[in-house]
């Protein structure tokens, strides 16, 4: 994933976090390839949100617009395909059922956190972002990094992970 796409995605996720303040957990999956990754299935929605559209730094706008149209889209993961460096929104409300990753994990983190961790090692998944009341985490190949964290009712943006990939 190129640096511009990483920075743009990071900015969009922080906008979602700031606006959501955190009413519900949000999972965003970036993947490559022509097909959706294994171990996920769409949940039917009516009305269905607009999908299969190129994102141009407007994921937060599209997400909250879709949420107004049908609040049930908040249940499930958002899938974004990277096609030649261009992010394309492929869908909302995906159920995840990845195989269990055999790694030590934090206790009491919930199903969204654990599904994000496990799904990050699925073939063709670039990374999984998990947004909840504590901030934004990025899972890549079973490794977790905090991108943004809420402390004392203030949002602190960590140095962008792209600038300092070794920091957690």
Where do the PLM segments sit?
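Divalent-cation
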Residues: 1-168
């Amino acid at each position: 994933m190129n640096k511009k796409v990483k920075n743009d995605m990071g900015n969009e996720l922080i906008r979602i976090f700031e606006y959501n303040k955190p009413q519900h957990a949000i999972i965003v999956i970036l993947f490559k390839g022509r097909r959706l990754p294994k171990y996920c299935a769409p949940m039917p929605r009516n009305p269905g949100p607009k999908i299969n559209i190129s994102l141009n730094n407007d994921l937060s706008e599209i997400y909250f617009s879709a949420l107004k149209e049908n609040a049930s889209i908040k249940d499930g993961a958002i899938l974004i395909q990277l096609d030649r460096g261009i992010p394309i929104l492929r869908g909302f409300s995906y159920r995840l059922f990845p195989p269990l990753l055999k790694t030590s994990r934090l206790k009491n983190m919930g199903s969204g956190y654990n599904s994000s961790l496990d799904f990050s090692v699925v073939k063709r998944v670039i990374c999984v972002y998990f947004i909840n009341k504590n901030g934004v985490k990025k899972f890549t190949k079973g490794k977790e990094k905090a991108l943004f964290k809420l402390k004392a009712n203030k949002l602190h943006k960590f140095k962008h992970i792209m600038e300092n990939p070794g920091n957690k």
